[in-house]
């Protein structure tokens, strides 16, 4: 998305500080767990049980983000109820029940404003590095032991009471990223946890124990067992993080990231992108273009390997095509700018300008900002589509 103007870096920083401060106050005064729809869900689950029995708790990312004052998107709930009990309880309600992962004890409740994923408490019986055979239980501590990181095993009930059997809140407060139990064993249970490790390391700039780093490097070959679709989903989550541009600051993290994604040949280009990121929003497609595109069509290999979406494929192809044009057409951002905005769209040209600066070391910041201002000032005419004049 285009910001609509060319804000200075200090102005944008001040805006972000104010926005985060307001959000923090808002979340403290109106915590997510007090939402009316969520309370209806918890009350429905509790029906038929005595008040001293905890039937459901929030868990995972929503609790972690609540504690760190981040925006909460996905809502995960752990419960002692079976999927059949959940379906029966919500059969004649305003919530639609979707069997998203019923083989693993998961269903999703969909309402007007929320999608809530409910999973029955469980323990792993057998794992193969990709999937697990599970047994359903009603023991909260045992359920916590099968989760990946301590910071993802913090539970929160409908009244805001924390249950933290793995001391995840302590690790979150002290910037520690720890597997629950033996790192080697946890990684071997599901090799996707290696990629998830990168996501949380980038997200919180967390301190990692040497045993964890060693276990990850020793098990990198296991990534080959994971479907490319699952890996791509995690990668896109990583690229959406505001801290991703700092990945080069940790040689250890960069090494692991490069081993998992050897297609990203141009991580150094991120250093130039860091100089201009404040001028526009940076999305995953821009980052992919910066790290992938070269004269050998490296991006095509990535698209094929990870079966990227048609949208991503088309966007990268368009970036590549126009970067080639930029080399040939010296007037691309000059006399031909209006024409190129008309045929490609203003958003695309803003992104292309970012990518071109990141890739081409000969482009100065002055040239970049000058081009950006010209793009933003162009008014693209809206033509009527109903035949009227």
PLM features per residue range, with description:
Residues 14-389:
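Catalytic cores of the polymerase beta-like nucleotidyltransferase superfamily
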Residues 2-4:
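Short, positively charged low-complexity motifs
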């Amino acid at each position: 998305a285009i910001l609509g103007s060319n804000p200075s870096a200090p102005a944008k920083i001040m805006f972000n500080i104010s926005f985060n401060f307001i959000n923090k106050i808002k979340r403290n005064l109106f915590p997510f767990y007090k939402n009316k729809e969520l309370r209806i869900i918890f009350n429905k689950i509790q029906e038929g049980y005595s008040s001293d029995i905890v039937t459901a708790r929030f868990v995972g990312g929503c609790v972690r983000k609540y504690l760190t004052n981040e925006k909460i998107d996905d809502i995960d709930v752990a419960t002692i109820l079976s999927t059949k009990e959940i379906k029966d309880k919500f059969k004649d309600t305003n919530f639609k029940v979707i069997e998203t992962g019923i083989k693993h004890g998961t269903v999703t409740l969909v309402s007007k404003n929320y999608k809530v994923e409910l999973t029955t408490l469980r323990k792993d019986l057998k794992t193969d590095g990709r999937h697990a055979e599970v047994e359903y239980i009603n023991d909260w501590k045992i359920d916590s032991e099968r989760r990946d990181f301590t910071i993802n095993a913090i539970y929160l009930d409908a009244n805001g009471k924390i249950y933290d059997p793995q001391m995840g809140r302590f690790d979150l407060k002290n910037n520690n990223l720890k597997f629950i139990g033996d790192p080697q064993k946890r990684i071997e249970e599901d090799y996707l946890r290696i990629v998830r490790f990168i996501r949380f390391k980038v997200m919180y700039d967390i301190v990692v124990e040497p045993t964890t780093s060693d276990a990850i490097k020793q098990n990198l070959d296991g990534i080959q067992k994971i479907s490319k679709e699952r890996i791509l989903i995690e990668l896109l989550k990583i690229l959406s993080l505001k801290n991703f541009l700092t990945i080069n600051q940790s040689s250890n993290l960069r090494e692991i990231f490069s081993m998992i994604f050897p297609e990203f040949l141009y991580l150094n280009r991120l250093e130039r992108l860091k100089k201009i990121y404040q001028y526009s929003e940076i999305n995953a497609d821009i980052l992919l273009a910066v790290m992938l595109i070269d004269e050998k069509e490296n991006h095509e290999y990535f698209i094929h390997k990870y079966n990227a979406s048609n949208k991503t494929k088309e966007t990268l192809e368009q970036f590549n095509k126009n970067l080639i044009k930029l080399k040939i057409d010296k007037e691309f951002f000059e006399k031909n700018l209006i024409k190129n905005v008309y045929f490609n769209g203003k958003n695309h040209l803003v992104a292309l300008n970012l990518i071109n600066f990141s890739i081409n070391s000969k482009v100065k910041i002055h040239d970049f900002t000058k081009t950006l201002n010209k793009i933003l000032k162009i008014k693209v005419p809206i033509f009527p589509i109903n035949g009227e004049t």
